[in-house]
C-alpha cells in the first residue's frame, strides 16, 4: 500500500530487486500480505515505473523522470547488491553519459530535483547537477567572452536557493563575478514579475507569496557584484523600489542606496522618481528620504567636498528632482528644505523654488525667506535674474539680498553701468505694476458696462427706445486712452539700457515661472 493507493503485486519480483521491500516483508507477520511504504519519493507515478522495471516492462528514462526514478530506486535500495544491472546502476549510466554532459538537461533535472528534497540531496543528485552546470557555463564563457543569454534564461527556471548555489559554484570554478550582472537581471525580471513597484496602490498578494518574493530579492542583492557599473543604475533603481515595496531588511535597502550613490552619474531623472510606498494614508508622491540618502552616498564617496565636480556631474539632475518634489502639495516645508540644503548653492534652483512657492502659497513669511535663501543670486543668469525681479514671489527677497546682481553682470558691466542696470530693473518693476493696475481698472469698467446692458435687456420692450437713446448717449469704452497709455509706457522701454543705434535686445518674458 502506497499513500492511499493499493497495488496488487507478486512479492518475488519486488523482493528480488528491492532490498527495502525485502526487509519489510521479512519483518511483517506471516499472516499479513500488506506492505505499507511511507513517504515514497515520486508518489504513485514513481512507484509504477519501479514496478515496470521489476516486471521487465520496458519504459523510457528521460529528463522528466530520471530524478524521480533515481530517488525511488535509492529509497527502495535497488542496488547491485540485490540484483545485477539493477535500477540504480541503469540510471547512473544514463545520468553520467547523457544528462550531465548537457547543460540544458542538467538544469532540467536539477529543476525536477527541487521537488524531491531531501532525498535528492542524499543521493548527491543536486550536487552533481550543479557541478555539471557550473563547469559547462565556465567553459562557455572562456570560449566566448560575450556572455550568452541562452543559458542565463535556462537558469531562471530554478528556485532562488538552487539558483544561488549554481552561481556560487560558477564563481568557485573561476567565473568572473562582475559578469553575473546580466544573469541576475534576467532572473529578477522573471522572479519579481507582477510587483506594482511603479504605483502607490495597496499590496495585492498573500503573505506567503510576499515572503517568497522578499527572500528572492534579498538573495539577488546579496549576489550583486561589488564592481562598479557591473549592473546599470536603472536596474538598481528597480531593485530598490521592489525592496521598499516588499519591506526587505534595512541592510538590503541601504546596500542598494549605496550602490546607486556610487553610480549616480549615470542616473536619469526617472531612476530617482521612486514612489513613496505608504500604507498608512500618507499622500506624499515621492520618497525624498531615500533619494537624499543616495545623494549623501554620492557626496561622501565621489565629490569629497569638491562642489565644482558636483555641479558638472549631477547638479542639473538634482535641480530637476527638486523641481519634481516642489510640485507635490503634500510635501512639507522641512523635507523640501532638508533636501535642497544637500545641494551646493552654486547649483541654480530658481525654477524649483518658484514652483514650491507657487504650490505652497500658505507658508509663513519666515518659511518663504528660508526657501528663497537657498538660491544664490550670484549664480543666476541675467535673464533669470531679471525674471525673478519681476516675480511677485521673489521681489522682496531679491531686494534684501546682499548681492542682488548676477555674477555675470558684475564681470561685464562697469560700476556706473551696474548701478544703471539695477535702477532700470526697479523702474521696470514699478511700471509693470502700474500697467497691471490700469488693466484691472479697464476690466472693472467693462464688467460694469456688461451689468448695465444686462439690466437694460431685462427691462422689456416698453423701454427699448429709451435704452437705445441712452446707449447712444453713453460714452464708449475708453480703449483709446488705455492703448495710448500702454504705448507711452512701452515707448519708455524701447531703449532701457542705453543701447546704440542698430543694436537689438532680446524681448524679456513677463511670466512668473521659467519652464
From Swiss-Prot:
Entry-annotated residues carrying Phosphotyrosine: 350
InterPro entries: BTB/POZ_dom (IPR000210), NPH3/RPT2-like (IPR043454), NPH3_dom (IPR027356), SKP1/BTB/POZ_sf (IPR011333)
NPH3 domain: residues covered: 149-409
Pathway noted in the entry: Protein modification; protein ubiquitination
One Pfam family named in its UniProt record: BTB
Function: May act as a substrate-specific adapter of an E3 ubiquitin-protein ligase complex (CUL3-RBX1-BTB) which mediates the ubiquitination and subsequent proteasomal degradation of target proteins.
Domain comment quoted from the record: The BTB/POZ domain mediates the interaction with some component of ubiquitin ligase complexes.
Protein known as: Putative BTB/POZ domain-containing protein At3g49970
Species, as recorded: Arabidopsis thaliana
